[in-house]
Amino acid sequence: MMTSSNPTGNEISQLEPSEAARLRENGSILLDVRTNEEFIAGHIQDVVFITLSEIEARAHELDPEIPLIALCRAGGRSQAAAELLAARGFTVSNMSGGMQAWEAAGLDFVTSDGGPGEVI
């Protein structure tokens, strides 16, 4: 696990997909911040989906007591979401490499109708 600093002074842990999957099994919530189109094409089952553009307005929907792991396609947008949420007091990590790394690790993801997912 690596960390990155940001302007808020909060260090954001950078997690590999396998570590994110393990933490998810232990109660952490995966937060997908990609676009609707990306999410429909392929997503991890049972994630919380809030686009990056909606994070500030919808942060109140998240439980600050449950650790979050933000993810996007490659890791940039989720890093921005993680920084924003950390500044609001959430415990949040970023999944390094995003859905591209999740797919490369051979981990499962699906389309909105339950079929095999695609990272776009």
Each language-model region and where it sits:
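Rhodanese-like catalytic fold shared by cysteine-dependent sulfurtransferases
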Residues: 1-29, 36-67, 76-120
